[in-house]
Amino acid sequence: MTRHFLALNQYTKEALDALFALTRELKEEQKKGIPHRILEGKSVALIFEKSSTRTRISFEVGVHQLGAHPLFISSATSQMGRGEPVRDTARVMARYCDGVMIRTYGQEIVEEFARYSSVPVINGLTDLFHPCQIMADLFTVIEHKGKYDGLKFAWVGDGNNMANTWIEAAAILGFDLALACPEGYEPDRTVWDWAQKKATSSITITRDPKEAVRDADVVNTDVWASMGQEQEQKVREVAFKGYCLDDDLVALAKPDCMVLHCLPAHRGEEITDSVIEGPRSAVWDEAENRLHVQKAIMASLLK
């Protein structure tokens, strides 16, 4: 049976820990200049229906460093953008390529693609989940803190794909997670209900960012209006007033807390310049670790 990386809920704690271990190994080799062309001679299709900076660059570079050939495909240059059924594209690409990464809108698109693909499919981002990013975030926490268990994670802002994936991660890995979201901007209800049934740790939601951040080891946020929600920007600015990660809010967390943001950041909205540039920020390590985590995911699925 073909294995895919579509959402964290497919994986056990042990499987995710194994990916973190492989990430560390590949990162150390890369820093030492030791080649690891594990996927020599293979080809990986990178399908983008949403524009990207970090996802595209990190996947293209990662595929190259693993010895494979990346094929960038946008909706404007593929038949998917003209209405070809997902199942048809999936079947054909599987005949040409050894793996596929998709960055798109609906989670149902990557799931249908995987259902009809005979090669591994990786979720590069959907409106529901962003599993590669959360894996990079968690690996960054492991690097800085030495662990994730026993820590309190805080999420401040929109209950978006990042928040949904953090909820899944907390339920699977067993760390405490406190979310602060305005009314009407909560995480996906199905994801929330699944996590509440599965979790052995504390996963809570509040309207008060101070309550969520207080005594946190890791504080995380994201933009108030995600891609495709630009027309809601003004309404969201009103709804998210008081949800900015500034120095006063971060001061409520533990003195050695980490601040994360998946980028791009709208400085002065969800996070201030002083916080993202400050000593608690691990944002740039987090961005780099997208490369290493995604290499581990591809290596584990495609080798």
UniProtKB/Swiss-Prot annotation:
Transmembrane segments: none annotated. Its EC number is 2.1.3.3. InterPro entries: Asp/Orn_carbamoyltranf_P-bd (IPR006132), Asp/Orn_carbamoylTrfase (IPR006130), Asp/Orn_carbamoylTrfase_sf (IPR036901), Asp_carbamoyltransf_Asp/Orn-bd (IPR006131), Orn/put_carbamltrans (IPR002292), OTCase_ArgI (IPR024904). GO terms for molecular function: amino acid binding; ornithine carbamoyltransferase activity. Pathway: Amino-acid biosynthesis; L-arginine biosynthesis; L-arginine from L-ornithine and carbamoyl phosphate: step 1/3. Carbamoyl phosphate binds at S52, T53, R54, T55, Q79, R103, H130, P131, C132, Q133, C262, L263, R290. GO terms for cellular component: cytoplasm. L-ornithine binds at N161, D222, S226, M227. Keywords: Amino-acid biosynthesis, Arginine biosynthesis, Cytoplasm, Transferase. Disulfide bonds: none annotated. Pfam families: OTCace, OTCace_N. It is found in: Cytoplasm. GO terms for biological process: arginine biosynthetic process via ornithine; citrulline biosynthetic process; L-arginine biosynthetic process. Belongs to the aspartate/ornithine carbamoyltransferase superfamily. OTCase family. This is Ornithine carbamoyltransferase. It comes from Geobacter metallireducens (strain ATCC 53774 / DSM 7210 / GS-15).
